[in-house]
């Protein structure tokens, strides 16, 4: 922990048109007007992890519940289970054996506040551990950030946001997923009213 290696981290975002062919393997048009078999991003990353078994690899899927998960993962629903890691199966388009190595970790991120999105079905859900990520206003990192800005008005704004979030959590029609996140207020080197006005004007609809 604490060491970043971009070669061992891959991040993608699912969407409604994302497919097994994009993720694992499939035929794609080539320059000659024909089709050729091409490997998807997860396939390539698994091979990379397999070639370096002494290192951990992390595959991050943003908006995981935006895609058709059963269609995207296909037969890999079995291989991503702990009990089947390292075991081989044949993929849909080839007789080549394929495996998801034990040193590869899949992290899926989803927005539970967007009720227009599909929830993860049980077949895939039971293959993941679920953790709720709450706004980080009370973390040591954000507290240090507040100390760096050292502005009483900013501190009062954050206190107000915490009160609003408490109200949101208690509202049965909303809940934790609708809380205002800390990222709106980050990455500012010094506090000024111009920044605050821009923040509120640009993000008032989402807030």
Question: Positions of the model-derived regions?
Answer:
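AAA+ P-loop NTPase catalytic core and its hallmark functional loops
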Residues: 1-174, 191-194, 198, 202
């Amino acid at each position: 922990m604490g060491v970043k290696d971009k070669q061992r981290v891959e991040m993608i975002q699912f969407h409604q048109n994302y497919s097994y062919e994009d993720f694992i393997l499939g035929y794609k048009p080539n320059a000659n007007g024909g089709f050729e078999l091409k490997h998807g991003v997860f396939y390539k990353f698994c091979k990379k992890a397999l070639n370096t078994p002494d290192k951990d690899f992390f595959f991050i899927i943003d908006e995981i519940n935006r895609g058709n998960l059963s269609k995207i993962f296909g037969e890999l629903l079995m291989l991503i289970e702990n009990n089947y890691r390292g075991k081989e199966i044949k993929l849909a388009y080839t007789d080549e054996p394929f495996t998801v190595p034990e040193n590869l970790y899949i992290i899926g991120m989803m927005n539970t506040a967007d009720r227009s999105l599909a929830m993860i079905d049980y077949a895939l859900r039971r293959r993941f551990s679920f953790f709720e990520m709450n706004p980080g206003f009370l973390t040591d990192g954000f507290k240090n950030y507040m100390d760096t800005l050292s502005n009483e008005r900013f501190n009062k704004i954050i206190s107000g946001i915490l009160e609003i979030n408490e109200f949101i959590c208690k509202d049965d029609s909303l809940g934790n997923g609708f809380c205002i996140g800390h990222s709106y207020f980050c990455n500012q080197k010094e506090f000024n009213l111009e920044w605050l006005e821009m923040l509120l004007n640009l993000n008032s609809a989402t807030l």
